[in-house]
């Protein structure tokens, strides 16, 4: 059963919802476009919580009625039927309680943002670079399934078709909310194409996921930037190495360096490089802020400093294991083609469960 503090909060939200419903029916509000739109937005934000709370109250009433029936009923068959229904209602109540708690959690302000993903080959030489390319294709496939757009910012390919590093933007509603869990060290176990003896090797690649920041969200003083141009080696056809379209930007105070050379024009490369710089600076400032308050758990991941592996792709066993939630799938090919939702959905659920646990530990400590 929900704690009194939570019930009080939900009743407060329901009361406000009813107030808004009443206001939206008034002529003076209907005629005031801005006020009407503002109230519609406020109602939309809390409508799901109110619907879920009303469902909770209905189920609670059903549970109480069934408990009374079990207690009072003389007929054994009817009592047995009521007990079965009671078990079913109890399960539904627990599910709705969890959903209500999850709805009350503060939203991550970056969840709806586009993202910048960076994949870097780790230990394993050429095989690690090939694995980095596999991961890029996996995320490309996932983005396509979601109807999101992918733009390469910069890449450092190898002779065998791998990537020492590839940086790309994923544009689409909720991209950060789904892909933020991919940050960390990914590990592959397989026989490399460069291996003649057939021995299984272990290689790694690091994935970083950063929310794309608007100019107003991350202030950059132009005086803090050193901008250089160079001859691009990107997809420029006859323009390759003939025009200085590549752009390298250094943020002097932080030492962060970003470069982009995949577009034909210097202007496009500069624009993309600035997007990456804003995202990296946001992460840099977040980390500084967390260090100042001695936070033990960094919220921003993907800096390449995390040594623990988050997921292993085992080719001989066709198995993918996410070590954070101790979950394995034996659909390796499907996962690498972009079927990631079975992992992402479980990771989102695990995060919510952890947040709820912490929230109610705090509530318990203050009540």
Curated annotation (Swiss-Prot):
Keywords: Cytoplasm, Methylation, Protein biosynthesis. PANTHER family: LD18447P (PTHR43804:SF7). It is found in: Cytoplasm. Signal peptide: none annotated. This is Peptide chain release factor 1. The lineage of its organism: Bacteria, Pseudomonadati, Dictyoglomota, Dictyoglomia, Dictyoglomales. One of its GO terms (cellular component) is cytoplasm. GO terms for molecular function: translation release factor activity, codon specific. SMART domains: PCRF (SM00937). Methylated by PrmC. Methylation increases the termination efficiency of RF1. It comes from the Bacteria. It comes from Dictyoglomus turgidum (strain DSM 6724 / Z-1310). It holds the Pfam family PCRF. Its main location: cytoplasm. The gene is prfA. Peptide chain release factor 1 directs the termination of translation in response to the peptide chain termination codons UAG and UAA. The modification N5-methylglutamine is found at residue 238. Belongs to the prokaryotic/mitochondrial release factor family.
